From Swiss-Prot:
The keyword Nucleus does not apply. Its cofactor is Mn(2+); Fe(2+). Binds 1 Mn(2+) or Fe(2+) ion per subunit. GO terms for molecular function: metal ion binding; superoxide dismutase activity. This is Superoxide dismutase [Mn/Fe]. The lineage of its organism: Eukaryota, Fungi, Dikarya, Ascomycota, Pezizomycotina. Its EC number is 1.15.1.1. Belongs to the iron/manganese superoxide dismutase family.
Length: 13
């Protein structure tokens, strides 16, 4: 998963 500081969740691609 990619940790995105601007989003309240982790995005898994």
């Amino acid at each position: 998963a990619y940790e995105l500081p601007e989003l309240p969740y982790a995005y898994d691609a």
